[in-house]
């Protein structure tokens, strides 16, 4: 079994990850809080601190990207490659209403055709491994069969499944 430290916005910053890694049983993989791509500017200081390898020594750190625009996703991957990253994680699990209202995170699951086009483009053009964190649907668990058919078309490094739909947030039974 592998153990991963999932990102919690505002909590699992590089300071938390480093302290955890030094004082507790190390995780097999650590994920950064999600980065929202900005095509016209670089990383903020906070984002840079979270992805700088020297702030996470000895950790298998994977930057998480939240986007519904292939060009922005790919641009962010190029910026991360400068730091030596060979894997990124696509966040399709965040249930926040502000995220979902923009069609990002688990909001992107409501548009399976758009998601398929997005994945097609990023997998054709990206030369790093891509893992995906997903929920089982936006509104109904029955959506997962279609989503799984889409994911199975691509060389996904790893599929991390949060067994709830977006509208459940973090409540109800998984």
Protein language model annotation of sequence segments:
Residues 1-174:
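Flavin-dependent oxidoreductase catalytic cores
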């Amino acid at each position: 079994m592998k153990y991963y430290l999932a990102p919690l916005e505002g909590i699992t910053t590089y300071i938390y990850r480093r302290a955890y890694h030094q004082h507790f049983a190390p995780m097999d993989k650590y994920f950064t809080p999600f980065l929202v791509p900005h095509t016209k500017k670089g990383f903020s200081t906070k984002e840079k601190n979270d992805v700088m390898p020297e702030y996470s020594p000895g950790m298998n750190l994977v930057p998480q990207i939240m986007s519904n625009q292939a060009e922005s996703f790919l641009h962010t991957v190029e910026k991360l490659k400068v730091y030596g990253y060979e894997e990124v994680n696509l966040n399709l699990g965040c249930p926040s209403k502000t995220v979902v209202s923009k069609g990002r995170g688990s909001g992107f699951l409501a548009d399976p055709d758009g998601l398929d086009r997005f994945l097609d483009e990023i997998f054709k053009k990206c030369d790093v491994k891509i893992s995906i964190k997903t929920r089982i649907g936006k509104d109904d668990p029955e959506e997962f069969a279609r989503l799984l058919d889409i994911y199975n078309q691509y060389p996904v490094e790893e599929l991390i499944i949060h067994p709830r739909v977006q509208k459940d947030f973090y409540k109800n039974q998984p």
